Amino acid sequence: MNEWVGDRIHVVGAGLLGTSIGLALARVGVEVWLSDRSQDNVRTAAGLGAGVPAPQGKTAPVVVVAVPPSAIPQVVAQSLAAGSLVTDVGSVKWPLVERIGRLVGPEALTHYVGSHPMAGSERSGPLAASAALFDGRPWAITPHPTSSDQAVDTIELLAVACGAATIRIAPRDHDRAVALTSHLPHLMAVLVAGRLLDADPRQLALSGQGVRDVTRIAAGDPALWRQILISNAPALREVLSDIQLELDELIGALDEPEDLDEVLRRGVAGTQMIPGKHGGPAEETASVYVSVPDHPGELARLFHDVGEIGTNIEDLRIDHDAGRPVGLVELVVKDTSADPLRDALEARDWVVHR
């Protein structure tokens, strides 16, 4: 990697994404400089092995800006003025191009390429970071019309070095895409979670894995999400208007079984449009449900047995029995592997629900 970026990369912003980028680059031998308004964040990230505090008065060949959305344009402009090649990891791209273009000259702007790793967590801060955060995840590279080829190639290689799979996409197209696949799901989770505030505790006692799955991402930092949503308001407003119409249709469909069937079938079909592992086509999967005692070592024993059986787990979920010290583990496997796995687990005395 050093042959195309020199021997240093400066990561500005030592939160979840910035620290994860530092950890990912450090594991492939890149020297990473870290800076942040919070010196505690820098010390924490450095202590985790994500890099070293950036020396005063020195410039790195490549700068990755991982600061809150409102601060990105100014930090990018400052780094471009210092002669660095710069990318940011903000969630919205075209408004940044416009704002940065008002702060720097045309020549400096050629050294800027936006990017957006499609990875994250409902948690924040350097302690939530991981060197593996980007492994196998899409990382959008969003060159604007005057981005230089060298700048685009460099940022693509940086993303690959972090373990990601790169996708080139125009900034406006990116913003429309994330409005649908990221920002809308977050808002739907927020609305569902918000409804729980007024629920009777007896109703909440019936909560299962479904409501946990739907609301998990609603726990994201409200201040950060406010900036993201406002900056992508035009694209998000369009998709929310479509959802508004569909909700009205859904309310009417509750009295029309055939119309309701169509809504539900569209939902099933939509899940098949989401790419599968490593960006490939979605594969047919099935779920195997296993009761696991809530004791130390039991989950590890289950995974060990599945590994010995020779079945690959595509995904998993864990639900807890409200009345007993037992968890229900849902193992998602390839459809053709489900029945053999059920039989093999029962032969090893696991309680399998058919």
Mark where each language-model region is.
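Rossmann-like NAD(P)(H) cofactor-binding subdomain of soluble oxidoreductases
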Residues: 75-127
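A conserved regulatory-domain signal marking ACT and ACT-like small-molecule sensing domains
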Residues: 270-354
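Glycine-rich, N-terminal phosphate-binding loop of Rossmann-like dinucleotide-binding domains
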Residues: 66-68, 90, 143
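NAD(P)+-binding Rossmann beta1-loop-alpha1 motif at the extreme N-terminus of oxidoreductases
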Residues: 1-54, 62
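Interdomain hinge/lid region at the active-site interface
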Residues: 200-268, 288
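Internal alpha-helical scaffold of NAD(P)-dependent oxidoreductase catalytic cores
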Residues: 133-219
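Residues in the short beta-alpha loop(s) of Rossmann-like NAD(P)-binding domains
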Residues: 37-38, 90, 319
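N-terminal Rossmann-like NAD(P) cofactor-binding module of classical short-chain dehydrogenase/reductase
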Residues: 63-64, 87
